[in-house]
Amino acid sequence: MGISEVGQEMRFGTVCLWRGDRHAYATEVELADSLGYDMICGGDSQSVYREVYVSLAVAAMHTDQARLGPMVTNPITRHPAVTASSIATIDELSDGRAVLGIGTGDSAIRNLSERPATLAGLREYVVALHELLRGRPVDWHGKRIHTSWIQRPVPIYITAEGPKTLELAGEIADGVV
């Protein structure tokens, strides 16, 4: 997986999926970290994989260098306050190594018979997350939400293939997956 932050050279990561034995998963993330991968990611699809933020917490306790994050979460199955709190917790556990990958939704959405987020919905979600990850309150669908305990912002990457999503990522994201 190639990851590019705005103004930075491309780095490489791997996806480690907790599929069974937790000890095997811990060994897998330790190996990826020791091999020098820049990022270790987990899939966020409730019907296919273990809970991504629990997996990332395990990874945080078994790695020292690689950045950690979901690749990718989505605006349909995750409320922005829950996502902000979850990734900020991973950031705290990993001593500042968290990143947040977001897309419109794939298997997590299809398996619930839902539709992926629109680009407008993705924009709204990412903008809200940027604010929440800075400890600022946000008006979300008519309700005021906040995550006042968060200590530092976490970089947000957007999955992008087409020109419209790439343009959106260039406007509001810290990087592209």
Predicted regions span which residues?
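Conserved beta-strand positions in the central sheet of alpha/beta enzyme cores
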Residues: C41, R67, V99-G101, V177
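Active-site-proximal loop/turn and secondary-structure-junction residues that shape catalytic pockets
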Residues: W18, Q46-S47, N74-I76, T104-A108
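Conserved N-terminal glycine/acidic-rich loop preference
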Residues: Y25, Y37-D38, I76-V82, A108-L112
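Active-site mouth loops of central-metabolism enzymes
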Residues: M10-H23, T73-P80, Q151-E161
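Internal, glycine-rich beta/alpha segment that forms the wall or movable "lid"
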Residues: G2-Q8, V82-G175
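Generic recognition of short, well-ordered alpha-helical segments
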Residues: A24-T27, E51-V54, A81-S85, L168-E171
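N-terminal beta1-alpha1-beta2 module of alpha/beta enzyme domains
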Residues: M1-M71
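Short, basic, helix/turn surface patches
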Residues: R67-I76, G96-V99, L129
